Amino acid sequence: MIAKLKGLIDSLGDDWAVVDCNGVGYLVACSSKTLARLETGTAAALFVETQVREDAISLFGFLETGERDWFRLLTTVQGVGAKVALAILSVASPDQLLQIIAAQDKAGLTRANGVGPKLAVRILTELKDKAGKIALGGFSPGGIKDALSASAPLPAASGRMEDAVSALVNLGYKRLEAFQAVGETARELGDEADSSALIRAALKHLGKGLLG
């Protein structure tokens, strides 16, 4: 089982890289975000997920363990194979995926090749409990590892947050940006803030461009 490759980038393609490790070239499939950070002729270290089948051994490479862990998490969803998981990671970083899933933002997933509305809903539904509470509480260095074992429902306070998010969406904001604004203001105002207070504060954040 190959877990990590360290060597020179021999060549790059649309969805792959060849890593030269002491004269042996390994073909590694990567997301476009990972490929954009690699350069032919330079040294690189890739964390690797190995998939063994009867007819092939496939390697998937990632510059960070967080992206690799998301790849593993995504492929637990029925209908999400390695190719689709990489397509999703090509349009959203691990932190962005946490936000997308916690916000139940279907549009954020359907941007990826191979992800239609039905599959997007399945991904959001199956991963919500694992990723949602991490995004609501802010990101931590081990966030996705915690999410992999998380089974607790979202906090009770999420009801007021969901009301605030829905109100902002009705005002024309995208669901993801509304979720980010409400999450930020909820952390600032604390548990005492009701949905109306969250809406007012979130609108100030959105109006001042304080997010992102």
Swiss-Prot record:
Residues spanning the signal sequence: none
Region of interest (Domain I), ranges: 1-63
GO function terms (MF aspect): ATP binding; four-way junction DNA binding; four-way junction helicase activity
Stored SUPFAM superfamilies: DNA helicase RuvA subunit, C-terminal domain (SSF46929), Nucleic acid-binding proteins (SSF50249), RuvA domain 2-like (SSF47781)
Gene Ontology cellular component list: cytoplasm; Holliday junction helicase complex; Holliday junction resolvase complex
Matches recorded under Pfam families: HHH_5, RuvA_C, RuvA_N
Domain of life per record: Bacteria
Key words of the record: Cytoplasm, DNA damage, DNA recombination, DNA repair, DNA-binding
Places the protein is found: Cytoplasm
GO annotation, biological process: DNA recombination; DNA repair
InterPro entries: DNA_helicase_Holl-junc_RuvA_I (IPR013849), NA-bd_OB-fold (IPR012340), RuvA (IPR000085), RuvA_2-like (IPR010994), RuvA_C (IPR011114), RuvA_C_sf (IPR036267)
Chain segments carrying region Domain II: 64-142
Chain spans, region Domain III: 156-212
Annotated stretches, region: Flexible linker: 143-155
Alphabetized NCBIfam families for the sequence: ruvA
Function: The RuvA-RuvB-RuvC complex processes Holliday junction (HJ) DNA during genetic recombination and DNA repair, while the RuvA-RuvB complex plays an important role in the rescue of blocked DNA replication forks via replication fork reversal (RFR). RuvA specifically binds to HJ cruciform DNA, conferring on it an open structure. The RuvB hexamer acts as an ATP-dependent pump, pulling dsDNA into and through the RuvAB complex. HJ branch migration allows RuvC to scan DNA until it finds its consensus sequence, where it cleaves and resolves the cruciform DNA.
Xref: HAMAP family: DNA_HJ_migration_RuvA (MF_00031)
Domain-level remarks: Has three domains with a flexible linker between the domains II and III and assumes an 'L' shape. Domain III is highly mobile and contacts RuvB.
Protein family membership: Belongs to the RuvA family.
Assembly, per entry: Homotetramer. Forms an RuvA(8)-RuvB(12)-Holliday junction (HJ) complex. HJ DNA is sandwiched between 2 RuvA tetramers; dsDNA enters through RuvA and exits via RuvB. An RuvB hexamer assembles on each DNA strand where it exits the tetramer. Each RuvB hexamer is contacted by two RuvA subunits (via domain III) on 2 adjacent RuvB subunits; this complex drives branch migration. In the full resolvosome a probable DNA-RuvA(4)-RuvB(12)-RuvC(2) complex forms which resolves the HJ.
Protein name: Holliday junction branch migration complex subunit RuvA
Organismal lineage: Bacteria, Pseudomonadati, Pseudomonadota, Alphaproteobacteria, Rhodospirillales
